[in-house]
Structures are given as C-alpha cells and as structure tokens.
C-alpha cells in the first residue's frame, strides 16, 4: 500500500519541477515490460523488517564515513545509486541499491553480480536507460505514480530519500543515514557526467523536506550522521557502536 498522503506530495513534485505525468506513467509501463518476474517483498523484508538499517547516500561526507561503515558488516545497507561505487571500491557490498540508473553503470552491474537487490526507479527522464534493468539478477521496479503489475510505489523522490522511504515501508526498527548531507556541495560520487547544479540542489532540498514529512509518520528510530534533518536525531559516527550492537 502506498504511504498515506503520498499522492499529494507527488503532485507537488510534478508542479514544482514541471514534470510530465504522462511520461512518468509511460516510463513505469516500459520498465514493467522489461522485468521478467515480480520480486517478492519478503526477500526485502528479511533484510529490513524489525532491523537496524543503514541508508547510505553519495554526499560529500560519505568518503570520511567509510572507515566507520566497514565496522558494521552484519547490518543491512541500503545504498543510493552513486554511493554504490564508493562502497564497492572499499570492499563493502550493498544489500540493496536504489537507483534511477544515472550512476556509474559498471558499479551498478558489479553490485547486481554480487547479489545486491536492485530497486530501479522509472521516471520521465530515464526511459532510454531502463533496458539496463534487464541485466540485473534481482530487480524490483518503482514509480512515484500509481503502482501496477511488477511496479511498486514506496514513496520518495531522489535516490537517497527513496532509500529511507523503502526502509520505512518495510518496517525497519531503526534507520541511520550516512552520507546524506542535503547541503550545497555535491559529493564526487553523487552523479555521473554533466548536470545542472541548481536543479540538483533543488532536488536535494525537496528530498530533505520529504524526509521531514516522513519522520512525522514513521514508527522507526531515525538518525543522521550528517547535517540536521527535522525529525531525525543527530549522532556522531564515532558513537554508532554505542547505539548499534
């Protein structure tokens, strides 16, 4: 079931970014046609439900966070697109990767080959990249619009905040954000190639506001190791081992 109130938030996104809903729906239909089977949610729930989950973004603080993250091998790591490269370069395999396929495709494929579950998001601007999803071993499709067929809607807008919405939807007891900075600097792993920085920052601001909205509805303990987010408790990386055992 889609999060209560999400449709209103989705309409805000369409209006604020001038997105074409027809293209959004078309993209979801194309992704649905590429997916051979519908990945069962219990495969994800086994990694998330009633567990402490790390959500890892590609913000500037990610690089300095990696030595701490490597200490928590047994905990589920849900990773936003670009951060996948940073983790794999440091011998950390994501459990789940949330991507709209604009990250480094070689590392996304490596994650899939290492048994990561790939959550591929369809939107109006990535239709030409959706065929990449065919090569992923374990793949679930998502949309911000109405779910159907093999396509789900857990909520969320950017890869980073979609990770949090996913963890919340599937019943994580504690969600800890790492590398989720939502600041004015873009991390080196955040996006491949040329992009519009102003639009990128606008998307990050929207993602942050969605997490603040989610925090008012979530039953999970919510923490961030980076810049403050309303509804999330701040915790230092050095104190994580006291919190998580």
Model-derived features with residue positions:
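N-terminal donor/sugar-recognition subdomains of glycan-related enzymes
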Residues: 1-53, 63-65, 194, 208-245
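Glycine-rich N-terminal segment of FAD-binding domains in flavoprotein oxidoreductases
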Residues: 56-69, 76-88
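Short, basic, glycine/proline-bearing loop/turn elements
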Residues: 49-55, 70, 145-152, 192, ...
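Short glycine-/acidic-enriched loop or helix-start segments at secondary-structure transitions
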Residues: 64-67, 88-89, 107-109, 129-130, ...
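Acidic/Gly/His-enriched mid-domain segments of enzyme catalytic cores or analogous surface patches
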Residues: 13, 30, 35, 47, ...
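Glycine-rich anion-binding loop/nest that anchors nucleotide
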Residues: 55-60, 159, 174-188, 224-226
């Amino acid at each position: 079931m889609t999060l209560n109130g999400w449709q209103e938030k989705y309409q805000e996104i369409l209006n604020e970014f001038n997105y074409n809903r027809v293209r959004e729906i078309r993209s979801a239909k194309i992704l649905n046609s590429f997916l051979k089977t519908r990945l069962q949610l219990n495969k994800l729930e086994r990694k998330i439900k009633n567990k402490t989950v790390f959500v890892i973004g590609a913000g500037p603080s990610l690089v300095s966070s990696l030595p701490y993250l490597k200490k928590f091998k047994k905990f589920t790591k849900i990773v936003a697109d670009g951060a996948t490269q940073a983790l794999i370069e440091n011998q950390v395999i994501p459990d789940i990767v949330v991507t709209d396929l604009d990250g480094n495709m070689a590392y996304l494929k490596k994650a899939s080959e290492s048994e990561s579950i790939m959550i591929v998001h369809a939107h109006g601007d990535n239709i030409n990249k959706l065929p990449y999803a065919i090569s992923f071993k374990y793949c679930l499709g998502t949309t911000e619009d109405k779910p159907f067929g093999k396509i789900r809607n857990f909520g969320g807008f950017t890869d980073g905040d979609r990770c949090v919405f996913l963890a919340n939807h599937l019943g994580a007891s504690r969600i800890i954000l790492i590398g989720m900075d939502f600041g004015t600097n873009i991390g080196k792993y955040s996006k491949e190639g040329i992009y519009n920085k102003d639009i990128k920052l606008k998307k990050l601001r929207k993602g942050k506001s969605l997490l603040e909205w989610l925090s008012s509805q979530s039953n999970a303990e919510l923490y961030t190791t980076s810049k403050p987010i309303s509804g999330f408790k701040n915790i230092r990386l050095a104190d994580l081992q006291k919190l998580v055992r």
